[in-house]
Amino acid sequence: GYYPFVFEDPHSYYEKVSRVIDKTVFEDIATYYNLKTPNLQYFKRLLTYLASIPPGDLNFHNLAKSLGVDHKTVEHYVSILASVGLVREMRPYEGGGPGLRKPSKILLNNTNLIHTLQQYLGHQPSKGMERELFFVQSLQNAGIEIFYSKQADYRTRKVIFEIGGKNKTRE
């Protein structure tokens, strides 16, 4: 597991991860960013939403509309979630030209968060979602700068990566 308490009691692991999420949102974010309790629910809803969609399918305008806030607020809240380590913000590879200038790709910070939030939703995470997040998490944790790309799923400054699955081809 991503968190050290996985060895303490594997049966209560996801419950403990859920408590980490709640503590981070309702105590750490509330205190550090001086946010009121009603606003904190948006953070939990954002995380749950991110766990339910394929990586890269986040549309700030649509999400803002469904939450009843403006898109700048959603963008700000996502940046807060990134600063506290609950999500990862991916930037486009600028070498691809103007066609890549779209909002950041937002991923949960690690696969344990996906499993915990999916369990909360009563779902199983998709293998593709897990595979992509594990890849990104591994490279970023190793200090490698990685971007999302129009050519393939991801790239570094020199190498292009397509995260395969059973329906992927070599083209």
Predicted regions and their residues:
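Interdomain hinge/linker elements that couple catalytic modules in large macromolecular machines
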Residues: 1-115
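A cross-kingdom feature that marks ATP-driven nucleic-acid transaction machinery
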Residues: 79, 85-171
